[in-house]
Curated annotation (Swiss-Prot):
GO terms for molecular function: ATP binding; tetraacyldisaccharide 4'-kinase activity. Signal peptide: none annotated. Pathway: Glycolipid biosynthesis; lipid IV(A) biosynthesis; lipid IV(A) from (3R)-3-hydroxytetradecanoyl-[acyl-carrier-protein] and UDP-N-acetyl-alpha-D-glucosamine: step 6/6. The lineage of its organism: Bacteria, Pseudomonadati, Pseudomonadota, Alphaproteobacteria, Hyphomicrobiales. Transfers the gamma-phosphate of ATP to the 4'-position of a tetraacyldisaccharide 1-phosphate intermediate (termed DS-1-P) to form tetraacyldisaccharide 1,4'-bis-phosphate (lipid IVA). Its EC number is 2.7.1.130. It catalyses: a lipid A disaccharide + ATP = a lipid IVA + ADP + H(+). Belongs to the LpxK family. This is Tetraacyldisaccharide 4'-kinase. Keywords: ATP-binding, Kinase, Lipid A biosynthesis, Lipid biosynthesis, Lipid metabolism, Nucleotide-binding, Transferase. InterPro entries: LpxK (IPR003758), P-loop_NTPase (IPR027417). One of its GO terms (biological process) is lipid A biosynthetic process. GO terms for cellular component: plasma membrane. ATP binds at H51, V52, G53, G54, A55, G56, K57, T58.
């Protein structure tokens, strides 16, 4: 889905027209968030956001999985598998699954950390535990009450913030902000910008910690692409962030094409991009998530076109403070779970 432009305008007439629906949607969402969830029997860390669309959750999940391994944990990611046909529960295997089976984000993450896809998250807990999970990392699902969360981390894009601050469909918020803030344990601001700082100020005023992070491109890929004209395309929550990252890396982006999030690329679309790249003497470049979705696409089996993925990793500005918060919450969770007192060795 493409975000409507009026979501980022403060007094758009469309938002005013949709306000009654937002009141109803917000009331239902807030009531749902207040419900109790299943205790998974192992600590659950949720990485979510306040709003619809991309904010950097996937690289945050991967960065947190690395941090948890440093703490001696064995994290398993639990995802709804948006865009995949399998309801699950299923353990994602990149050797046999495609994005059409399990979704593009789980497929991409499974190259780095064990991932379980389950349309109903509570049903995926058992499989995650059989995969050796000492901690479950929920990819999204902050507003979903099905599981009790021991640590809720909210991710926002510093450049975008919360748009017009209104609840869907008048704006991008998934629920009214006050009940979401009440259930937030910490905020992670990815990148910089006044919009993100405004959200950070509200979270700080609520007595919650704020962590800063940035996306770090792979230096070897940047070096390989330097000096080459690039035709960039992306079907993610915020394609413009990807294009900005390319340019901020000093790369020569001669053209760009934005698609909706989780867009199922057609052979004709890829062929058209390849033709345009040839005419411009450009290299096709996209995100890791988009390349995961293109995996197995028959046109990619040919020698032409060659599509380069542009990998990024999330770097925390103060990993020590975040590590301390995570370790404290894990210890607290295990105090109420006597059957899971010790972390794996």
């Amino acid at each position: 889905m493409r975000e409507p432009a009026f979501w980022h305008r403060p007094h758009a007439w469309q938002s005013l027209l949709l306000s009654p629906l937002s009141v109803l949607y917000g009331a239902i969402a807030a009531h749902r968030m207040a419900q109790s969830g299943l205790d998974a029997g192992v600590p659950v860390i949720c990485v979510g956001n306040f709003h619809v669309g991309g904010a950097g959750k996937t690289p945050t999940v991967l960065a947190l999985s690395a941090l948890l391994r440093e703490l001696g944990e064995h994290p398993v990611v639990l995802s709804r598998g948006y865009g995949g046909r399998l309801a699950g529960p299923v353990a994602v295997d990149p050797a046999i699954h495609a994005a059409a089976d399990v979704g593009d984000e789980p497929l991409m993450m499974a190259a780095h950390v064990p991932v379980v896809v389950s349309r109903h998250r509570a049903e995926g807990v058992g499989l995650a535990k059989t995969q050796g999970a000492s901690v479950i990392l929920m990819d999204d699902g902050f507003q979903n009450p099905s599981l009790t969360k021991d640590l809720a981390l909210i991710v926002i894009d510093g450049a975008r913030g919360l748009g017009n601050g209104r609840v869907f469909p008048a704006g991008p918020l998934r629920a009214p902000l006050p009940p979401q803030l009440a259930r937030t344990d910490a905020l992670i601001v990815v990148g910089s910008g006044a919009a993100g700082e405004a959200v950070a100020a509200r979270v700080t005023a609520a007595g919650k910690p704020v962590f800063r992070a940035h996306l770090q491109p792979d230096p070897e890929v940047v070096a390989a692409l330097a000096g080459r004209p690039l035709l960039a395309f992306a079907g993610i929550g915020d394609p413009q962030r990807f294009f900005r990252t390319l340019r901020a890396s000093g790369l020569d982006v001669v053209g760009e094409r934005a698609f909706p999030d989780h867009h199922p690329f057609s052979t004709d679309e890829i062929a058209a991009l390849a033709d345009k790249a040839r005419h411009q003497g450009a290299t096709l470049v996209t995100t890791q998530k988009d390349l995961a979705r293109l995996r197995g696409h028959r046109i990619l089996g040919r020698s032409d076109p060659v599509i380069t993925a542009f990998p990024v990793t999330l770097q925390f500005s103060d990993p020590t403070a975040l590590r301390s918060l995570v370790a404290h919450r894990l210890a607290s969770a295990r105090q109420r779970q006597p059957f899971a007192l010790s972390a794996p060795g």
